[in-house]
Amino acid sequence: MTTDLKKTPLYQNYVDSGAKIVEFGGWAMPVQFSSIKEEHNAVRYNVGLFDVSHMGEIEISGKDAEQFIQYILSNDTNLLTNDKAMYSALCNDEGGIIDDLVTYKLNENHYLLIVNAANTNKDYQWIKKHSSNFTVDVSNTSDKYGQLAIQGPHSRALINELVDIDVSHMAMFEFKQNVQIFGKSIILSQSGYTGEDGFEIYCKQEDTKDIWEQLLEYDVTPCGLGARDTLRLEAGLPLHGQDLSESITPYEGGIAFAAKPLIENHFIGKSVLKAQKENGSERRTVGLELLGKGIARTGYDVLDENSNEIGFVTSGTQSPSSGKSIALAIIDRDAFEMGKKVIVQIRKRQVEAKIVKKNQIEK
């Protein structure tokens, strides 16, 4: 592994625990601590803890911040409040997804954007470039934050014990600022990337190690990127760079709920997304379950029963929960029918599959 990879504040903890470390988005990250299946099941049935400090943070502040946020994001940012976050897309003029991200409104003129690690610098430069006509300050503050995700059906009860507020009724994407945990001040968000109940903790970078170590004193399993990927794929949640890209729109990528092109305010990519909203997109994302042996890898062709190409696999794995071979794929809209049999071209073999719901969590 090259030595110029970025490291989170927990890198030495990975090394000391014997975690398997890999390169991901320019970072040295743990792919697993024990086994992917063990970590996956900990999140599905108990509590797992992820270091996601590699994610990027971009802050936008100033008199025109509210107006600018709507200009660059595809969702209706008028619905943002000081305690409610929002999932959205940063789109180009063609409606393609530069990145998918979560936005926190810290106050009337101050927003925090959480972006994908590999896209942080690209996003920052793009946002900065488009800010010239607005009175805003755009800052890449990724070095300021640590981020941990505590996920699983028992995570809420545990967090409720450890923080100074009642989280028992916190709804999805609700967040609170200046929450205390282990004597540290954090932003606590009811969110995650696993398909389970859970929370994300944003802390000062220098507090990350202490919070991580104290959380692990409870019945919590440290988890790596391997389980994060199988969990999100079972839940049908997209990964930018595979399921989403600059040539895939929110309507094609299965995140139509994050696009609101019928709102009055203009945003970049709105005209293309409005046409897709009104007329339908030519492609759509589906779930696949393979009926034969093999894993559907990113880029494999999807064919109809007459061997005509109708799309391609964006992500695939063997589900640790069900043992089934599952995938996400983008196919032609006209080829879609729930339960329909299709073929995945796995190297020289053709493997039968069927179209299913994107969320394939089985317990």
From Swiss-Prot:
InterPro entries documented for this protein: GCS_T, GCS_T_bac, GCST_C, GCV_T_N, GcvT/YgfZ/DmdA, GcvT/YgfZ_C, TrmE/GcvT_dom1
GO MF terms held by the record: aminomethyltransferase activity; transaminase activity
Pfam families named in the record: GCV_T, GCV_T_C
Keywords for this protein: Aminotransferase, Transferase
The EC number(s) this enzyme carries: 2.1.2.10
UniProt-listed GO biological process terms: glycine decarboxylation via glycine cleavage system
EC top class, as a word: transferase
GO cellular component, one term: cytosol
Catalytic activity: N(6)-[(R)-S(8)-aminomethyldihydrolipoyl]-L-lysyl-[protein] + (6S)-5,6,7,8-tetrahydrofolate = N(6)-[(R)-dihydrolipoyl]-L-lysyl-[protein] + (6R)-5,10-methylene-5,6,7,8-tetrahydrofolate + NH4(+)
Subunit and partners: The glycine cleavage system is composed of four proteins: P, T, L and H.
Function: The glycine cleavage system catalyzes the degradation of glycine.
Family: Belongs to the GcvT family.
The protein's name: Aminomethyltransferase
UniProt source species: Staphylococcus epidermidis (strain ATCC 35984 / DSM 28319 / BCRC 17069 / CCUG 31568 / BM 3577 / RP62A)
Lineage: Bacteria, Bacillati, Bacillota, Bacilli, Bacillales
